């Protein structure tokens, strides 16, 4: 009997070692799935839909919230860069149809008010076209973070928001939020930035110039003040600039004067044959709001340093809204990729 007992203990011990080794392999998984998505805030939806005669009212935020939830679940990403977060989406009002409530407790949100820089909660922090970060708590943990502004003159304001704006630099509320994060499965630390750049003209200064300055400020500040050299990083944003436009081409694509060598995930995936079906056939990240056709712009981008790109795609699907009819959840399409820490 004693011999059988020792054999039994040995079997259990070997099994435990085997299971432990398997769990260890899972825990060391070096991949992370990321997304950038402009959600089209409730205020902008209402203003646009009310001004048009051919826009389906199911595109208001409240009836569209269930479509947005389906899209987010379909994407199944570990971390999101969201743009245009307002009170209805975050849940300061209309809590039952807020994306924050619908997604549930498995996700954490990090936002700082683009009005005064305070961290946003249910009771504090003003929101308007606010960029933010949403992440799966079982995969990513937050270490620290903050906000800087894209619309200020860096020589005068040092990227601190002021009530007035220099027309050459655009809307002072345009901002980038950043976070230093830990990827739990691999134990890797990385930086994640979410931003929304300008698409308007101010005081006779044209959109291209304003957008150029936003692009310059974003990349320069991230390079010199936010991300340390040697740490993996991701910039996921609505740049409001195509790859061929001056803002992106001059200040985003050109790495020659920067410490960091960020690269566009789309271009990496295209060159390596890792584009998804939709991105390969139709690399467009916007629709025309009336849903009659796709847009022609690819203005939402993910930039990386310190990662291998495993795949990249764009979700151009429609989802069921409150009345059962199918619509695009936003006027943008979500851009997503699977990355591997190098």
Predicted regions and their residues:
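Acidic/histidine-rich helix-loop elements
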Residues: 36-64, 153-170, 201-210
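Metal-dependent phosphoester-hydrolase catalytic domains
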Residues: 139-141, 222-234, 240-342
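Active-site beta-strand/loop signature of hydrolases that rely on acidic residues for catalysis
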Residues: 33-39, 68-92, 134, 179, ...
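Active-site neighborhood of phospho(di)ester-bond hydrolases with catalytic His/Asp-centered motifs
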Residues: 81-83, 110-114, 234-238, 264-267
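Structured beta-strand-rich core segments of catalytic domains in phosphoester-bond hydrolases
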Residues: 85-191, 197, 314-315
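N-terminal, active-site-proximal structural segment of metallo-dependent hydrolase catalytic domains
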Residues: 2, 18-105, 112-129, 216, ...
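Bacterial N-terminal signal peptides
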Residues: 6-15
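Active-site-proximal beta-strand elements of phosphoester/diester hydrolases
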Residues: 31-50, 54, 144-148, 189-199, ...
